[in-house]
Amino acid sequence: MDFTNYKAHELKNLISKKEASVEEVTKAHLENVKNIDEKVNAFLYIAEEEALNDAKALDEKLSKGEDIGLLGGAPLGIKDNISVKNMQNTCASKILEGYISPYDATVSESVKSQGGVILGKLNMDEFAMGSSTENSAYKITRNPWDLDRVPGGSSGGSAAAVASKEVPLALGTDTGGSVRQPASFCGIVGLKPTYGRVSRSGVVAYGSTLDQVGTLGRDVKDCALLTQVISGVDHRDFTTANINVPNYENSLSENIKGKKIALPKEFFKDGLDPKVQKAIYDALEVFKANGAEITEVSLPLADYAISAYYLLACAEASSNLARFDGVRYGHRSESVEDAVDVYFKSRSEAFGKEVKKRIMLGTYALSAGYYDAYYKKALKVRNLIKGEFENIFKDFDAIISPTAPTPAYKIGEKTENALEMYLGDIYTVPVNIAGIPAISLPCGVADGLPVGLQIMGNYFKEDTLFNLAYSYEQSTKWHEMHPNL
């Protein structure tokens, strides 16, 4: 029995029926990581000893008849900007090389308390700044569908690990599409929850008003399961909302009769690969056949989301990353003469090119004389975009679009063209600007590579997204596609 072929909810059932032990399941996945990861490069740290100890402890609980939680012994990986006690937390940056987290992020704590076995930390773009996982200071993660292509980013390690069956589940973070776009490129399911649905305590900040921890799995049910575990109010994060978390499993119904879906015409313009467009239109026919009503709408301000996003995110990054100064932790330059030198040289030596670029852009946007022209204006645009989404959700249950304008591209293809790379997030960024939830799920192939469909929902309506996504998934076979490694 190859446990790596099972999804998390299936492994949970096998373990609860005593048809497998947590240790057996953990060992099988660790073996897969050893065999596959030298090709894929999804992991930055493999926590073999910790995982086996946790698995044995869960088996011990089961032997006493104790409940081990919603995850029930399923393995998972954690993006390397989410703190896990006694594991590295480098954010794929040289500036945090060797840093070991002394505490758990709230989401890591939740995963452990609900019977999840953490197999290690996953690669990413440095400080989550990027769309391809080529900006990692340590290694380039490869797409399991084609090892010469990117897995997406910044949670590329998370998506690649799930797609290659190294883990059935993973946590990532999503600031402008960093869970959904890699999910699309790797042919899996990825959810970015509503801003405030999931705690950010213990997550290294990039853009504090945009960041959200998201979930990745090989099907909608697995994503719903992991989202259930990490959602809810947290006294350590005052931005979490004290709003009831529904039982997401109850929303996994194929019945979507009467659901109203909006189709924004601005998301189907120049730059969209015709094969991706066809996959989305084919998917719309499935939603119609299942009883949903689809209407074309206009979201004209969505065109300004990318511009507003890069001003806001970079401004927040400029502030958030000021703490990495070579004084308290992380890299410290050895060739220094005074305190200013420590700060300047440590950051110059250890931050990567993309991180430096975004810090400079953000500092410029916040500087005297430019604040009103750039940052303040971007905040106004953000409010207008939020208003547009809120108006649509008065009449509709969801909005559908492509997740990305193209399938996965070749490694190195867009590294020298920043604008082209940034425009790859054109469909995902508006979601973070507005703070709404969105899910990406596989809906077809283009040139043998997965295509993702994005469903956006109203605030705290993740259950509606799971309902629509599950209905589509059960009517198609795309989620059963797997890469051959």
From Swiss-Prot:
Q: Which PROSITE patterns match?
A: AMIDASES (PS00571)
Alphabetized UniProt keyword annotations:
ATP-binding, Ligase, Nucleotide-binding, Protein biosynthesis
Catalytic reaction(s) noted:
L-glutamyl-tRNA(Gln) + L-glutamine + ATP + H2O = L-glutaminyl-tRNA(Gln) + L-glutamate + ADP + phosphate + H(+)
Cellular-component GO terms for this entry: glutamyl-tRNA(Gln) amidotransferase complex
Q: Which domain of life is it from?
A: Bacteria
Protein EC: 6.3.5.7
Query: Which GO molecular function terms does the record list?
Result: ATP binding; glutaminyl-tRNA synthase (glutamine-hydrolyzing) activity
Family listed: Belongs to the amidase family. GatA subfamily.
Q: What is this protein called?
A: Glutamyl-tRNA(Gln) amidotransferase subunit A
